[in-house]
């Protein structure tokens, strides 16, 4: 399986602008810039896209883990908070924190925790990141 996305950047780092697109078309010339990345201006940035990908990947991985334990989730809601810091080697993604809440009928806390931990380590996006990944997982009734 392969997935494809592209980016075009025009101009210098601080005064330039770019667009990002995905082969599916869900991202189509979506703008980004220095200010959307480092100054909290409205718009997207690479780190936000990584966080979104991680939240989506983890949610699907958790669903797979639960299904493998004969548990069917009603809902899984995941947010990913990515931390990027300037280190001696330059800007580095140092951590991602996953906050997940799930409704899973018939699940007990132990089974849910096992599924969540397996999803955290087994999610393909988790595997590609070298950052510390922490998690708060809540089973809701």
Q: Model-flagged regions — what are they?
A:
Residues 1-52, 59-141:
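Extended beta-strand/beta-hairpin segments
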């Amino acid at each position: 399986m392969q997935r494809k996305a592209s980016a075009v950047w025009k101009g210098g780092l601080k005064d330039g602008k770019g667009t990002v697109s995905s082969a599916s078309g869900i991202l189509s010339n979506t703008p980004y810039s220095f200010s959307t990345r480092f100054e909290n201006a409205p718009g997207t940035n690479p780190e936000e896209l990584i966080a979104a990908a991680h939240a989506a990947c983890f949610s699907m991985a958790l669903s797979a883990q639960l299904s493998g334990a004969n548990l069917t989730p009603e809902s899984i809601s995941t947010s990913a908070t990515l931390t990027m810091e300037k280190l001696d080697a330059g800007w580095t993604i140092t951590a991602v924190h996953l906050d997940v809440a799930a409704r899973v009928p018939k699940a007990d806390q132990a089974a849910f925790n096992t599924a969540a931990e397996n999803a955290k380590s087994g999610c393909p996006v988790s595997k590609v990141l070298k950052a510390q990944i922490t998690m708060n997982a809540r089973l809701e009734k």
